[in-house]
């Protein structure tokens, strides 16, 4: 119901991550819940569920392990990144298979005042092709991801963003998609 979704949204804004364990939801329910949080986006590199292009398939097997093991925020390579992501595990091994979460609000709050002052006016480049460099290097990777690279040119975002609803400051860089801090020399940006 709308009232339940409103309460979930309030909790998400407050806590930044929420978990619903052992939920058996359909693709339609998954999409309906996601719709409540804002416009849905498709990912340019992942396969999707038939008739549900907004639901991506992330699969990791012994034969084909995941390539994304770095800390990151999903789709920061977009001019308008999504508000968040909803992850639903269909098959989870008894050990491993973890998805970890970290608060960039807590990271910001832990910074000293001089560091906050340094970062507040900096911007960073986020690049799809940087995040998918391993996939692009695979045989056929450039051809397979050509359209995704063309449709997602590098974008610039503030290093420190304010959440539009909570007003909290968050660090908005990540090792997967952030290529450089624009205003710093390369050696400092890379540090």
Regions found by a protein language model. Name each.
Residues 1-191:
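Non-heme Fe(II) oxygenase catalytic core, chiefly the N-lobe of the double-stranded beta-helix
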